[in-house]
């Protein structure tokens, strides 16, 4: 039952606050995958931003980056993209950078390169209220479906560490056959 749900689970975007011993917030995407011999595992792309430098404009301007990373994950999983090509797509997303709410480049992320231009759907964060809710030093992580493949928006807030109940909710619609 788990594999049936896992195989069709969406790509999830996340924003994870700084936690014990880690002075960085983590933004990224995680997707279900299966190798040629049938082993299931998640594939993850992350970007770390110093927690002390985080401000809401970072998330406000992250939509194109999430879109591009989700697209790269989907292509890799569905079409067997070579690792070098996948890495190139992720690095290109990072070089494209983030846009701030004002449309300019954010100083924190200036190391990522110039801002990206793209379609309006790619420029809107799927969860527009998130920048107002996310606390870089809090204990709640936020998860929402990546919509690069047309998946409907689903959201989740999770208190505490990354654990079985969280991944069960994301990848098996709450079914935990091993529990």
Task: Give, region by region, the residue ranges found by the protein language model.
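N-terminal ordered "arm"
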Residues: 1-10
């Amino acid at each position: 039952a788990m594999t049936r749900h896992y195989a069709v689970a969406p790509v999830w975007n996340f924003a994870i606050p700084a936690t014990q011993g880690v002075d960085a917030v983590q933004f990224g995407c995680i997707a279900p995958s299966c190798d040629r011999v049938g082993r299931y595992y998640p594939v993850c792309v992350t970007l770390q931003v110093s927690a002390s430098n985080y401000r809401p404009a970072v998330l406000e301007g992250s939509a194109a980056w999430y879109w591009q990373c989700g697209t790269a994950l989907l292509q890799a999983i569905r079409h067997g993209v070579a690792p070098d090509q996948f890495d190139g797509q992720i690095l290109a997303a990072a070089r494209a950078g983030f846009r701030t709410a004002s449309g300019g480049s954010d100083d924190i992320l200036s190391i990522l390169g110039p801002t990206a231009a793209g379609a309006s759907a790619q420029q809107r964060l799927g969860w527009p209220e998130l920048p107002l809710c996310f606390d870089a030093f809090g204990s709640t992580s936020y998860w929402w479906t990546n919509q690069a493949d047309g998946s409907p928006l689903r959201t989740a807030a999770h208190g505490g560490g990354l654990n079985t109940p969280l991944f069960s909710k994301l990848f098996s619609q709450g079914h935990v056959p091993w529990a």
